[in-house]
């Protein structure tokens, strides 16, 4: 019996796959537990339509991420912070990934999740700093920061 897997089943198939499985296994286990459904012509057509819409959405997200990557790569995209500095040259407050995300949106209108900004430890020094950021899956970029004395 041909079935369309609705979820990953270890050793049998992944979500969205159409596979031939024993009839008893399909009816008594996979279909009863909503892990698969029978692969009728209509169900296969729905699956293909769903896969096309997912591919289109993925392509749009990739294009959007590449646009953000290009904007971050421009020389003009320099996120500036003005912080109070102590006598030892370190800032009183620290610059975290949350602050960077907020300033990036405020100064350039670029929305990034703070969890994707890779700051090893909060920034407490003055000067130019490059911060790596994961924009979408394999697409990464670098945020240029300038921390000034204020």
Swiss-Prot record:
One of its GO terms (molecular function) is structural constituent of ribosome. Keywords: Ribonucleoprotein, Ribosomal protein, RNA-binding, rRNA-binding. One of its GO terms (cellular component) is ribosome. PROSITE patterns: RIBOSOMAL_L9. One of its GO terms (biological process) is translation. Binds to the 23S rRNA. Belongs to the bacterial ribosomal protein bL9 family. This is Large ribosomal subunit protein bL9. It comes from Streptococcus gordonii (strain Challis / ATCC 35105 / BCRC 15272 / CH1 / DL1 / V288). The lineage of its organism: Bacteria, Bacillati, Bacillota, Bacilli, Lactobacillales.
